[in-house]
Amino acid sequence: MDYSTVKQEEVEVVVLDGEEEAAAAAAPVPLPAAMGVGAAVAPFLVKTFEMVEDPATDAVVSWGGAARNSFVVWDPHAFAAGLLPLHFKHANFSSFLRQLNTYGFRKVSADRWEFANEDFLGGQRHLLANIRRRRRGAGTGSTTPRAVNCGGGGGEGEVERLRRDKEALARELARLRRQQQEARAQLLDMERRVRGTERRQEQCTEFLARALRSPDVLDNIARRHAAAVERKKRRMLAAAADDDGLTFEALALAAAADTSHSTGGAVTTDMIWYELLGEEQAEIDIEVDQLVASASAAADTASEAEPWEEMGEEEVQELVQQIDCLASPSS
């Protein structure tokens, strides 16, 4: 009896895009006899399994966890530049991803390149024969459950991640817009203050220029100030102690009415001076109070130097009448 030895050769087909992918489906690679007679698997699956199973490439691609039911491409650049050219005739990572999708692999993590297939398990090479390639143009009804789930979980996770990123960017944009509005409001307020300061400086400059051209203005102001001090001293001596007296500004305006015979230019200059002094009225009142207090102290000293006993009865009577006149409302 003659015995013949039949050697089963492995036919290698490199799967690429387009027509070359169809050639891979037409020429599957038979697996070793240990995996079962007649079992065949696509070269793409065999080479992918070998890359993942090789411990020397764990830094680039390896099994995803202790269960070894998924694999992770840790470094896509090194994977495309170093491993793909060794097993395929291309170095295109996108083409590799399309091939995974064709054979029913799904992306199981939105944060890393992790893929899984229920028949692609570590140490179980014989299960590769159960993975079938999806046909182009096949209807939804003829698609296997693995093909339906292909990329489903990963796609939803990617959409959710993009939605969260969009919401975070929208919140950041709203925060930046609020900061811009606040900065713009502060800038407008600062510009308003600067314009007010410049306007006051111009008014002061104009007033000083007019005062130099008409020296009588300063004399009028000095006389009115002295008159205000004198009137306040009289009120204190009369012991009226009321708070409804005229302010310095009112006294100045009254004095301006008394000197209405002056020229029109001088009156205009005086009005500018009153406007400038209006904001410093409190300081002027304090100064007036100090002058009145000094005058009162001097008057007290003089009264102590001249006792009432030395005054005659007629002089005392005349002084009382003067005080009554000053204290009366008609004064």
UniProtKB/Swiss-Prot annotation:
Sequence segments annotated as region (Disordered):
135-160
Q: Which ranges belong to the motif Nuclear localization signal?
A: 230-235
Residue positions of motif AHA1? 270-279
Q: Which InterPro entries match?
A: HSF_DNA-bd, WH-like_DNA-bd_sf, WH_DNA-bd_sf
Q: Name one GO biological process term.
A: regulation of transcription by RNA polymerase II
Q: How is it modified after translation?
A: Exhibits temperature-dependent phosphorylation.
- Coiled coil (residue ranges): 156-238
The motif Nuclear export signal: which residues?
246-253
- The record lists the membrane-crossing segments as none
Q: What does the entry list under GO cellular component? A: cytoplasm; nucleus
Cellular location(s): Cytoplasm; Nucleus
Enumerate the Pfam families for this protein.
HSF_DNA-bind
Q: Which SUPFAM superfamilies match?
A: Winged helix' DNA-binding domain (SSF46785)
Keyword Oxidoreductase: yes or no? no
Q: Where is this motif: AHA2?
A: 305-313
| Region annotation (Hydrophobic repeat HR-A/B) ranges | 162-212
The keyword Cytoplasm belongs to this UniProt entry's keyword annotation: yes
- In the UniProt entry, what is the domain comment? The hydrophobic-rich region (HR-A/B) corresponds to the oligomerization domain. AHA motifs are transcriptional activator elements.
Quaternary state and interactors? Homotrimer.
What is stated as this protein's family in its record?
A: Belongs to the HSF family. Class A subfamily.
Record's PANTHER family? HEAT SHOCK TRANSCRIPTION FACTOR, HEAT STRESS TRANSCRIPTION FACTOR A-2
Query: What protein name applies here?
Result: Putative heat stress transcription factor A-6a
